[in-house]
Amino acid sequence: MDARMFGLETPRVAALHHLLDVPDGDKAGGGATRTYVRDARAMAATPADVKELAGAYAFVVDMPGLSTGDIRVQVEDERVLVISGERRREEREDAKYLRMERRMGKFMRKFVLPDNADVDKVAAVCRDGVLTVTVEKLPPPEPKKPKTIEIKVA
């Protein structure tokens, strides 16, 4: 059932609905698909900072306790930056959890890149549990010079 029907729409939920809007033909029986719900939860649990720098865009995501093998950075559909992965629970035979507050499971964020982003120049660095993905900007286009038309005498 859609939360909007009960007046429970918050700005965060509205943003998720906008970002993850599924075409009507992709919904089974008018409800959200399992993939849609899973992706919405993964995106809501992955906050990020996006900065515009002089020559690049920077996407900063906290990734405490994850190794680079647990994180994927991809560009899909030519203009969508996807940061995803999975945080797994540490399993030990000689220990049991008394409290589990850290989020486990899959995480994901998608960002539509601006037209001036150079998708061939993407770099990712993970330092001290913080992932920074840098996407360089394309150089600005050269201004078009006016074309001079020769005037003929008739």
Swiss-Prot record:
Keyword Cytoplasm carried by entry: yes
Keywords linked to the UniProt accession: Cytoplasm, Stress response
Pfam families given in the database record: HSP20
Sequence ranges assigned to domain sHSP in this UniProt record: 39-154
Keyword Oxidoreductase in annotation: no
Subcellular location: Cytoplasm
PROSITE patterns (alphabetical): SHSP
Disulfides per UniProt: none
CDD domains: ACD_sHsps-like (cd06464)
Gene3D superfamilies reported in the protein's UniProt record: 2.60.40.790
Organism domain of life: Eukaryota
Any GO MF annotation of the entry: unfolded protein binding
Principal location class: cytoplasm
GO cellular component annotations of the record: cytoplasm
Induction description: By stress; by heat shock.
GO terms for biological process, alphabetical: protein complex oligomerization; protein folding; response to heat; response to hydrogen peroxide; response to salt stress
Matching SUPFAM superfamilies: HSP20-like chaperones
Recorded family membership: Belongs to the small heat shock protein (HSP20) family.
Record's protein name: 17.0 kDa class II heat shock protein
Origin species: Zea mays (Maize)
